């Protein structure tokens, strides 16, 4: 929705005129003073600079629309507006070279504005981005708003399963080490190394935490599941794998493969399945040699862009007008 620039508010300045006295005893009549006209607020200037989200290169020849006022970015990616002040207005960018971009900006005072847009080409694949970030593989055509963390989550690592049975310390060490690396690796350092606390309790529903837990009776069709970017959410790892399981979770040397842990952390950070067997977030059955798979380069490229957008950003690249609350989603993997 595009918001028009608000009309300026005019104030009226009231002046009081006082008559003087002459040397004579007769007073001169007071001459009435006409009221002043309306005062026009000083114009404000918005000076902007448009760059690529990945790489930071200037984006030239991009059409700009601010509240219905149009211009084009210069060779250096710059643009400028001068008008009467308002409050906020929607700013949009469009060109064959970028994914259309839209955001809301304040226009109440003179200011500089740094904006970035997703440049097409150079390895960026919009269809892949929609699968990984908007769940277009899991629910084709029903694109999700962006979900992510805005601060580094703390991890609560349960030391017992859901029935109270103790978990092997060596397995807990593996999970902790994998999680600490995965959070920073997935986000390219946008999130730091998480604090990990161990115990028999839970931090589900507690803001700032992700709880890692283990069902007492293992599932037969998956190796894990997680809520997608839920503050106070959880990850389940299938520590107890039934003999009837068709998921193929166990591999030599691991109770739960490192790739499964990294995959579930990906969900907890806001990612979905891609359907590509070469990806860590594929959501497909994998082979033993992939048990220690790391995120691929094109997965990391897409996540880096997503972590430069606010929660609630919608397709193709439109920021919300205000903060949003999103209902929890849960994703399971084979």
Show which residues each predicted segment covers:
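Metzincin-family zinc-dependent endopeptidase catalytic domain
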Residues: 171-277, 286
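Bacterial signal peptide processing site
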Residues: 19-23
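Short, acidic Ser/Thr/Gly-rich low-complexity loop/linker segments typical of extracellular
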Residues: 60, 65-82
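Metalloprotease/metallohydrolase-associated module, dominated by Zn2+-dependent proteases
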Residues: 233-256, 272-334
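Disordered inhibitory propeptide/activation segment of secreted metzincin zinc metalloprotease zymogens
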Residues: 31-38, 96-173, 309-334
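Short, ordered, surface-exposed loop/turn motifs in non-cytosolic proteins
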Residues: 44-47, 52-68, 176
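C-terminal motif of bacterial Sec signal peptides marking the signal peptidase cleavage site
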Residues: 14-17
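Short Pro-Gly-centered beta-turn/loop motif in secreted/extracellular proteins
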Residues: 29-30, 80-90, 107-109
């Amino acid at each position: 929705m595009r918001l028009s620039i608000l009309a300026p508010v005019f104030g009226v300045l009231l002046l009081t005129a006082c008559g003087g006295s002459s040397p004579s005893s007769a007073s001169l009549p007071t001459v009435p003073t006409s009221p002043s006209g309306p005062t026009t607020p000083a114009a404000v200037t918005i000076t902007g600079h448009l760059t690529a989200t990945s790489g930071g290169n200037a984006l030239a020849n991009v059409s700009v629309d601010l509240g219905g006022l149009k211009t084009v970015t210069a060779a250096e990616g710059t643009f400028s507006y001068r008008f009467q002040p308002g409050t906020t207005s929607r700013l949009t960018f469009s060109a064959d070279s970028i994914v259309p971009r839209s955001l809301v900006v304040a226009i109440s005072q003179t200011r500089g504005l740094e904006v970035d847009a997703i440049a097409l080409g150079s390895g960026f694949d919009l269809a892949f981005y929609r699968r990984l970030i908007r769940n277009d593989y899991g629910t084709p055509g029903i694109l999700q708003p962006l979900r992510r963390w805005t601060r580094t989550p703390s991890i609560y690592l349960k030391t017992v399963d859901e029935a109270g049975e103790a978990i092997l310390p060596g397995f807990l060490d593996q999970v902790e080490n994998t999680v600490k690396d995965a959070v920073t690796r997935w986000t390219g350092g946008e999130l730091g190394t998480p604090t990990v606390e161990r115990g028999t309790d839970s931090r589900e529903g507690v803001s700032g935490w992700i709880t890692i837990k283990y069902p007492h009776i293992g599932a037969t069709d998956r190796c894990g599941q997680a809520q997608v970017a839920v503050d106070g959410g959880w990850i389940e790892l299938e520590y107890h794998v039934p003999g009837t399981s068709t998921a193929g979770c166990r591999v030599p040397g691991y109770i739960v493969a490192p790739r499964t842990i990294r995959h579930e952390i990906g969900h907890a950070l806001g990612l979905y399945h891609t359907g590509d067997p070469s990806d860590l977030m594929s959501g497909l059955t994998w082979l033993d040699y992939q048990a220690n798979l790391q995120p691929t380069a094109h997965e990391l490229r897409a996540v880096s862009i997503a972590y430069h957008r606010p929660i609630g950003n919608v397709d193709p690249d439109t920021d919300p007008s205000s903060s949003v609350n999103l209902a929890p989603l849960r994703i399971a993997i084979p």
